[in-house]
Amino acid sequence: GFGEDIAMKQHQVNSLLDILFVF
């Protein structure tokens, strides 16, 4: 659903931020 899509996007963004902040 729409809420699920948002949650997925947020998870992807958080993962990318985690990767960036590691470097």
UniProtKB/Swiss-Prot annotation:
Chief place where the protein resides: secreted
Keywords: Copper, Oxygen transport, Secreted, Transport
Superkingdom of this protein's organism: Eukaryota
Residues annotated as transmembrane: none
GO molecular function: oxygen carrier activity
Keyword flag Secreted: yes
GO cellular component: a single term: extracellular region
Compartment(s) where it occurs, according to its Swiss-Prot or TrEMBL record: Secreted, Extracellular space
Tissue: Hemolymph.
Role of this protein: Hemocyanins are copper-containing oxygen carriers occurring freely dissolved in the hemolymph of many mollusks and arthropods.
Annotated family: Belongs to the tyrosinase family. Hemocyanin subfamily.
Protein name, entry field: Hemocyanin subunit 4
Species assigned in the record: Carcinus maenas
Record lineage: Eukaryota, Metazoa, Ecdysozoa, Arthropoda, Crustacea
